[in-house]
Amino acid sequence: MRTRFAPSPTGFLHVGGARTALFCHLQARHVGGTTVLRIEDTDRERSNQALVDAILDGLHWLGLDPDEGPLFQSDHTQRHTDMALKLLEEGKAYKCYCTKQELDDMRAAQQARKEKPRYDGRCRHRSEPPSDQPYVIRFKTPLEGEVVWPDMVQGTIHIANKELDDLILLRSDGSPTYNLAVVVDDHDMEITHVIRGEDHTSNTPRQIHLFQALGWDVPSYAHIPLLHGEDGSKLSKRHGAVSVLQFREEGFLASALNNYLVRMGWSHGEKEEFTMDEMVALFDVNNVGRSAAIFNTSKLLWLNGVHIRQSGPEQLRGELMWHLQRLGVDNPNPNFIDQIIPGMQERVKTMLEMAQMAMFYFKAPTEYAETAVAKHLHADILPAYAALLEKLHTVTADEWDNGGLERAFKVVMAETGAKMGKIGQPVRIAISGSDIAPGIYDILQLVGRHESLRRLEVLLSFFQQRVHGANG
């Protein structure tokens, strides 16, 4: 089996395209086949290298690197042209000299008769073609019968040939059209299975005709349902993030996005959570449903949190480091990253949230969250906090661990009568700037004795000024 993902570099890799790439990847991997990436860049005006790079980056982040490619459609223009000329020589195509005005008049007349606008084939049997007039080359679509194919998702599809007009193969400037290029490339790249969005279904009968006219084997087709927003309309930018790399920037894991996308049209019992290995083992495009899949960002966010909680530090390290560097942390130490991850996994739903929470490990807070200050820095707890800070100064570097810190806290709580919930939150605010942070003993150890005591002293000054200022 050879599948292909064939995006056009006229926009970023969006989630709909990513799901198609994922389905191609899974179907090929499931049977030990091969995936090919073909960049369909024949629209030279709208294609550019930056968008090609963005597509490659998106696929790489998702873990969907192809076995072959990227191959560029524009590299095979001469081959596409040769095949059109071959069909012309064999009488399976013809030169059409119709002017734009003629075509416009033809469509206007058809619309006036309430007919479907289509080319009427008037140049098929033109006896005296003008010698100096520009022309296109059109395919002679069969006039009778129908095209039938067993779609792996949609079931058997029948299209009457009378619904199809004579497809342009070469434009008047000699450039090949999309459908011709796709057929030639699919044949030359030995593609056996074409998995693509159902918006391509209308191209399939035309492409099947070309395969047959050229004497080539027709691949198997699977047209998967499109992604829709929660309002039922086709997914677009107005529904929020649609670019794969934008999801990364917002803190989603590739594993979670893949997991969510595979569930857009496919299921395996009641199971919601899948690893890539599980998807490869279980996925079959024949089991993809026909109805449109609704993209629900809230559900993706929930699933992302599940993947964060179930992943080991080594699985999250690279993504957290990427986000930290974007937030201004230079070259974070991987071993230190592995130590801080477990304390945050249960508290966040995105890797961006984790990176933002982790910033205090690298940079002391320059201000404190107003809600945390108002809630926890009260005059009645100031004496206990001051006593705790004094006690922590007596804890040596060798004792600065869970056991040593816990003993110091317990002594102060016994002496002052303060509860852990009361005395602990000011410590958390001092170290992290917020009352939402990992365990107190953990953050004191990870920030280190010297820096922790410095931050605790800074908060003491702030605390005293706040209390005395309020009383004064």
From Swiss-Prot:
Its EC number is 6.1.1.17. Its main location: cytoplasm. It comes from the Bacteria. Keywords: Aminoacyl-tRNA synthetase, ATP-binding, Cytoplasm, Ligase, Metal-binding, Nucleotide-binding, Protein biosynthesis, Zinc. Residues 112-134 are annotated as: Disordered. GO terms for cellular component: cytosol. It is found in: Cytoplasm. GO terms for molecular function: ATP binding; glutamate-tRNA ligase activity; tRNA binding; zinc ion binding. ATP binds at residue 237. A motif ('KMSKS' region) lies at residues 234-238. GO terms for biological process: glutamyl-tRNA aminoacylation. Binds 1 zinc ion per subunit. Monomer. This is Glutamate--tRNA ligase. It comes from Magnetococcus marinus (strain ATCC BAA-1437 / JCM 17883 / MC-1).
